[in-house]
């Protein structure tokens, strides 16, 4: 059975002090947690070290929101995998829709980043998803399958990779794909992985849902056969709400 994974993506929110306080509150809200669901937190770059220290011994993974595909050099504003690993990150989010939309991330650069993260020994959360226009055009399957196929091109082993389906039209809008809509795309993603790596690998890979997940809808979403947790945005900025979502995966 696949272990659920719930990751809070704090995006560009919270100072270092606020982030540390929120991480501490999340630990308290989770209590003993549950072995059936893995939890992670992705704060801003400046807060990674402090939040990582706050999370020590909690079992909650420290997650980075992005990275560069080069080890070092003249890449102003970027951060390397070595830097992230040095502060204790175990996962890196790659290809988030906001990175694709606002910062020119492409399937090609997503692929380069994935290879760099896996080579570093950290794990990847690969984000895929369609826009509202693409859904209305009926090309959701084509878009998502392409993002998976191109993102994983030349990647031989995806043992340390999680896929997050995030319909762009549902991120931060209050709109949520119905559990059946989400399940349909998750099944398509799993079938795409099956075509690339075989049935055993496709049944083992974890696929999160991201897009206005809340405590009130998490249990229904997580009950779907191909939904293995969530990549949580706004709701992860509230410790009680995030803890409730994690517990929905238990």
UniProtKB/Swiss-Prot annotation:
PROSITE patterns on file: TIM_1, TIM_2
Record GO biological process: gluconeogenesis; glyceraldehyde-3-phosphate biosynthetic process; glycerol catabolic process; glycolytic process
Family: Belongs to the triosephosphate isomerase family.
Protein name: Triosephosphate isomerase
SUPFAM superfamilies per UniProt: Triosephosphate isomerase (TIM)
Purpose of the protein: Involved in the gluconeogenesis. Catalyzes stereospecifically the conversion of dihydroxyacetone phosphate (DHAP) to D-glyceraldehyde-3-phosphate (G3P).
GO cellular component terms attached to this protein's record: cytosol
Catalytic activity reported: D-glyceraldehyde 3-phosphate = dihydroxyacetone phosphate
Name of the gene this protein is made from: tpiA
